[in-house]
Amino acid sequence: MSAQVATVGKITQVLGPVIDVEFPPGGLPEVYTALKVTNTSISAEADNLTIEVAQHLGENMVRCISMDSTEGLARGQAVKNTGAPIQVPVGQGTLGRILNVIGEPVDERGPITSSQTWPIHRPAPTFVDQDVRVQAFETGIKVIDLLGPYTRGGKIGLFGGAGVGKTVLLMELIVNVAKERGGFSVFAGVGERTREGNDLYHEMQEGNVSTPRTWMESQCVLVYGQMNEPPGARARVALSALTIAEYFRDMEGHDVLLFVDNIFRFTQAGSEVSALLGRIPSAVGYQPTLSTEMGALQERITSTTKGSVTSVQAIYVPADDLTDPAPATTFAHLDATTVLNRAISELGIYPAVDPLDSTSRILDPNVVGPEHYAVARKVQGILQKYKELQDIIAILGMDELSETDKLTVARARKIQKFLSQPFHVAEVFTGAPGRYVELKDTIQGFKELAEGKHDDLPEAAFYMVGNINEAIEKARKLAAA
């Protein structure tokens, strides 16, 4: 965005979160420019409300979208042109903090120490800067690494209802990236419940992911635009979080994890803004620019020659309709899907990832290697056979099965148990120390199980352990007890 002359305009109309501002001739701000106005109903500070230029109406008039409450504004009030887009603080000073859409701290722990700011509207990396190598991103979580591996610099969709463990899985990924890889995580709360955002922060403190005492050593940034915020804030908070992540990738060369909860709310906020600006709606009432807005966000999430931004996005599916334009547009950008299943969580298996529904673009022998691919497909085959046999077992019982099927069921139940794993962030609840399992150990363990090398061990030995050696040791203790 080119440098602009700082000018002062005046409010001519306020329609909810939409504000029309008139500027003197020759002083019209560009689209996406941030303007400042004083709203005494928010606080006593001057220029405390940020609004963003969305449209040029002609006659030196611009239409803007507010990032906070517009109650208390009046016609004729002065509006300052900042001459630049919304800028958010970036760098080490943001770690361990909670920010809002315009980069202000909302955790009551003083100002942000970072001296550098970046604009939230930025171009995607050019083809020359992108890293075209396809690489798996090791998470240390067995079920993900084996059956639905994540791509470095890729985009992952996380599907799951309330209470099946989405938040715990997100927190474990944050911990594993911080501990094992020294990487940073940025969490964008887009249109989520304030209570959930608050709970996440306090659970992170209990799980030692982000603590006030050690926030300088913390490796996580939280950026929130909750449900009660105006649509402008909810439509921009994902961009603010992404900008912070891009700084760590481009300037410090880190592998960054970006969590977005919930990407549907980003689309929903864009739809509200579009309607407020008077655009004619598209299919199902969504904005006509849906694909463009989603593409502008998603194309910035990628690997470059300096580092990577890998994104895990929780996706709400309206009325369970996968053909709805909002989730359908998101699916086009995803490299992997991790599906959390309530039926699995009811069995007490955590993480409750569905091994048959979760998919990955890189579960391919040319990317993950022939051994990994063969083991993953064999494990899925055994689990699929078990699923098909469950109706027979429910009606007739195990005794009616053939010897081969009995063996398949026994192995499948062990595999199902072995897909569980103790998490670092759940230590405070379970008392069991968390486990990070390396990919080679995961492949070896499941290979031995699928081949029947541990048919003599009890099922209980495979529940909530790390690698296969721990399961063997647990079986020895169970036998001795």
Curated annotation (Swiss-Prot):
Recorded GO MF terms: ATP binding; ATP hydrolysis activity; proton-transporting ATP synthase activity, rotational mechanism
Record's GO cellular component terms: plasma membrane; proton-transporting ATP synthase complex
Positions bound to ATP: 160-167
CDD domains: ATP-synt_F1_beta_C, ATP-synt_F1_beta_N, F1-ATPase_beta_CD
TM stretches of this protein: none
Cell location: Cell inner membrane
Location (main, coarse): membrane
Catalytic activity line of the entry: ATP + H2O + 4 H(+)(in) = ADP + phosphate + 5 H(+)(out)
Its job: Produces ATP from ADP in the presence of a proton gradient across the membrane. The catalytic sites are hosted primarily by the beta subunits.
Family assignment from sequence similarity: Belongs to the ATPase alpha/beta chains family.
Family annotation (HAMAP family): ATP_synth_beta_bact
Quaternary structure, from the entry: F-type ATPases have 2 components, CF(1) - the catalytic core - and CF(0) - the membrane proton channel. CF(1) has five subunits: alpha(3), beta(3), gamma(1), delta(1), epsilon(1). CF(0) has three main subunits: a(1), b(2) and c(9-12). The alpha and beta chains form an alternating ring which encloses part of the gamma chain. CF(1) is attached to CF(0) by a central stalk formed by the gamma and epsilon chains, while a peripheral stalk is formed by the delta and b chains.
Protein name: ATP synthase subunit beta
Organism (species): Stigmatella aurantiaca
Gene symbol of the encoding locus: atpD
